[in-house]
Amino acid sequence: MEDKKFKKLREINRKKNYFFKRLRFNVAKVFIDKWKRNEFYSVDIKKILFLRDDNKIGDMIVSTPVFKALSQHGFELHVLSGYSNYCVIESNPYIDKFYFYPDETKEIVKLGLKLKKEKYDLVIDMGEQLPVIYLLFIRLINAKNVFGFNKEKINIYNKNLKYSQYESHITERYKILMKNIGIYAYNMQYDIHVPKNIQDEVFDLYADLPGEITVVINPFAAEERRNISKEQLIGIISHISKLRPSVNIILVGHLDKLNTLPYLSECIINPFGSFLSAVEIIRQADLVISPDTSIVHVAAAYEKNTIALYGNDKHGNFVNNHVWGPGNKNAIQLVQKKENSKISEIPLDVILEQINFFLNKLGK
């Protein structure tokens, strides 16, 4: 009875917070937004700012084929990044300039005024959320054109597309973007660039491994409830070691978390620690196991054999398992039936069955 009462109170509180948030936004919009929507001109576009400052690594990975296509079609491309997802593009040759989105309001305003001097022909915003400060930021940039999705009530976005493909893969949204810019010849394969020195370090690591098959496991995700449990991880590693004792097992992810796993003596922890070293380790691997969509997308970039572990979540109306699915012909996606369930609730024997399938397929 008490649980139901608290659940009801939380629901009321959420609705109240949402109401006041919308009220604050609508009041601010009166002063910040344009009074009318300008006409969208695609023919004169030469310089583009792509907003990818949400700090989500997976979103940045999915954006990389668009960066490549825009550059190859002659556009000058600048990218606004977060500090956490910049690692994906730090060696990307198709981006002419990078900027970082700051945390403090004062610095956000200063950056907006700085970007105004770039005189952008187009700003691309692939995001769903639009806080008041971000509305002001885009207004300050004062680009000729601003492209967005589901921003029909905001006049700054003079090219708005209503998007309600709640079960379509995220790449479908990018295809719509490309069509509206007038680009039809492009490849949506994810495009991650690893510097030569990191490639050489990982090559040396693999050269010292005893086995011919390498399985890469990423135990952790951005949210704790999406982590592989201790019991699952021990079960997976033990099963692989017994089934194929010669298989190399490498763990990738945040070193501070990986170093808290003293029970994994049969594994190699990525000794380099960086995101791009994990990318290169995955590129050379035979099988990847991960609950984290960013690592699943890295594996997809190289069409690696993948066991992708998903809960059953919704982000608004969007079905996460479909929108952020592997998009990889060599991936098997294991999804919980119960909504908002934990990865730890996926039965171990279901995971082991797929490991058996891939190891038999590799057959070395």
Which positions does each model-derived feature cover?
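Conserved nucleotide-sugar phosphate-binding/catalytic loop shared by glycosyltransferases and other
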Residues: 2-10, 76-108, 266-267, 329-336
